[in-house]
Amino acid sequence: MRGLDGNTFIIAGGATGIGAGTAKRLASEGANVAVGDININGAKATVEQITGEGGRAIAVEFDLSDEESIKDLVDATLAEFGAIHGLHNVGADLSDDNLGRDTTVLETDLDVWHRTLDVNLLGYVRTIRAVLPRLLQQGSGSIVNTSSGGSLGTDPMHLAYNCSKAAINQLTRHVANNYGAKGIRSNAVMPGLVMGETQERQNDKQMQQMFLAASKTTRLGKPADLAAITTFLLSEEAEWINGQTWFIGGASHMRQ
C-alpha cells in the first residue's frame, strides 16, 4: 500500500490480537514498527516474528496509564527509526479482574469505572498527546484508534468498557476536526467479536453464538480482518478518509 514502505508506525498495544496482527501486516508492507505493550514478552514475540521474516521492528514496554512510559515509547521509536508517521491505539484493560466485573450501571463498582476510563480512554489521550506534535511538525500523519461495536449500544453489559469506547469515537472525530487541515488523519475501527487471545481465554460460548447469530456472515472475526482495514487507514491509500468510525463485524450490528 502507498505510504507504508520505509515509514514508521507505533502500535500502542501490539503484544497479541489485533495489535500484533496490524504490526505484522505493516511490516509486511515494508514499514518500520514500534510494538509497545505492558506485556513485554508478547511484544517481543511479535517483533521476533516480524524480524524473522526480514521486517524491521522493536519492542518497548509501556503502560497506557503511565505518561512517562508513553514518552519512553516515543523516544525509543525516534531513536531507532528517526521519525513517526502514524499511531495505532489498540490497547485496553481486558483483564478478568476489570472487564469481568464490568456489568450494569447499578452493579459496576466505581474502581472499575476509574480503571477502565484511565486505561481505555485517557490512555489514548496520552498517546495522542505524545505523538501528535511530531505529526504536526512534519505536516502529515495518520492515527487509527480501536473502538468497539459495543460503543453502538448493542451490548447490554460491560457498560464502563462501552462508554470508554464511545468516548474514543468522539476523540477520533475531535482530532480529525481540529487537525485535519494540518495534514492529520484520525479514524477509528469498531470491531465486532474478534477471536483473539482474550476471547479464547474467556471462552464464552454463549456470547460467541449470539454474535454469530446476529452476523450476516458465516464466522466470527479474526485479528487479520482488523489488521487489513487498520493498515489501509494508516496508509496514504486512505488519504481522503478522516474522522470516520468503521464498524468491522460481519454486519452483526444490524439487528433483526
Which residues are covered by each model-predicted region?
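Canonical Rossmann dinucleotide-binding motif of NAD(H)/NADP(H)-dependent dehydrogenases/reductases
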Residues: 2-34
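Short, small/polar-rich loop/turn modules that mediate ligand/substrate recognition or access, typified
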Residues: 82, 180, 185, 190, ...
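Catalytic Tyr-X3-Lys loop
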Residues: 85, 106-125, 140, 144, ...
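Active-site helix of classical SDR
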Residues: 128, 164, 172
